[in-house]
Amino acid sequence: MEKLRMNVQGRVQGVGFRYMTKMVADQLGVTGSVRNEDDGSVSITAIAPEDIMETFIKKIKDSPSPAGRVTYVDIQEDPLLEETEQFKVIQ
């Protein structure tokens, strides 16, 4: 299992990015969370097998929201990330 933290920058707030990210995660079976940050970026924690994670990252980089636009994604491994049963949107 890969355990990653991502910080996504671009037009990612106010465009349905978090909810579309959850939809993609649910379709792929990725668990974790997504939340808006004060600096206008979005933070994602994600846990999935490597092949599924590759697909998830590609979809995030392409922006799951049609109105969104991703300009940069910082990805860090975090082996201490706690596993969850679902993917949730944090308000």
UniProtKB/Swiss-Prot annotation:
Pfam families: Acylphosphatase. Belongs to the acylphosphatase family. Its EC number is 3.6.1.7. PROSITE patterns: ACYLPHOSPHATASE_1, ACYLPHOSPHATASE_3. Keywords: Hydrolase. It comes from the Bacteria. The keyword Hydrolase applies. This is Acylphosphatase. GO terms for molecular function: acylphosphatase activity. The gene is acyP. The lineage of its organism: Bacteria, Bacillati, Bacillota, Bacilli, Lactobacillales. The keyword Hydrolase applies. Residues 3-91 form the Acylphosphatase-like domain. It catalyses: an acyl phosphate + H2O = a carboxylate + phosphate + H(+). The active site is at R18, N36.
